[in-house]
Amino acid sequence: MKTIMLCAICSVTQGNCVEDCAYCTQSAKAGADITKFKEKSVQQVVDEAKMAYKNHALGFCLVTSGARLNDKKTDYIASLARAVHKEVPNLMLIACNGMATYEQLCELKNAGIFSYNHNLETSREYFPKICTTHSWDERYQTNLDAKRAGLMLCTGGIYGVGESEADRVSFRASLKELEPFSSPINFFIRSDALRLDQPPLSADEALKIVRETKSALPETRVMIAGGREKILGERQYEIFENGADAIVIGDYLTAKGEKASKDIEELTKRGFSFASICH
């Protein structure tokens, strides 16, 4: 019986991001019709954490919109982490808050954050094609600082944004340098609101990406996140035969995901168990 890790996302601030990431509907430049809000209440976040834990999630990720942390946002995330840790102590708390300083990351670590998620997204060479308002090097440095602060590292990216095979190889080589604890794979889903217009990946290509990622990062938990349901469809649970160790359950940031109950039912039927402790 294979044990897999489930992770849930909690979007605690959403929309109105001034960055121009071509794949992201939260960018104000995209003009996407999404729900926007500044800060969820502490109680709402705690309630979502309790539901995630009830649905067998081990990871619970506190996600903010925007390019980077500032002192106010850092204090907010730290307060959420303390509240969730008090009410649901067995959850592994992850923060995904953009670029950050070493000092800010230390504050999150001290508040009970276990892991920091900041994706490289793609290769250093291709990144300027999909984002011009900040650099790939800034992202890489945040990952280094997260490790230095004692946080476990969660970094991955998005496929199907027009990158070449050489870009994919370069991207995975950069991930390997960072030796992340976990690495999320997202598959791009086209939206009329986005300037990026790329055809969807085939299921075969998506599964090949999973295999190649696990081959490049054998000691890392490979997590399949955005696009799993739409790109893979009925073949989505084949990801585990191809090297995946974890999935995101429930909804994503601005997109609906599979119902957690359906994932749990299908995975249980296939003989999987769910990680309840992080090691």
From Swiss-Prot:
Pfam entry (one): BATS
Binding-site residues, [2Fe-2S] cluster: C61, C96, C154, R221
Class of enzymatic activity (EC top level): transferase
CDD domains: Radical_SAM
Molecular functions (GO terms): 2 iron, 2 sulfur cluster binding; 4 iron, 4 sulfur cluster binding; biotin synthase activity; iron ion binding
EC numbers, comma separated: 2.8.1.6
Domain Radical SAM core: start-end pairs: 2-228
Subunit and partners: Homodimer.
Function as written in the Swiss-Prot or TrEMBL entry: Catalyzes the conversion of dethiobiotin (DTB) to biotin by the insertion of a sulfur atom into dethiobiotin via a radical-based mechanism.
Family assignment from sequence similarity: Belongs to the radical SAM superfamily. Biotin synthase family.
PANTHER family: BIOTIN SYNTHASE, BIOTIN SYNTHASE, MITOCHONDRIAL
Protein name: Biotin synthase
Species this protein is from: Campylobacter concisus (strain 13826)
Lineage: Bacteria, Pseudomonadati, Campylobacterota, Epsilonproteobacteria, Campylobacterales
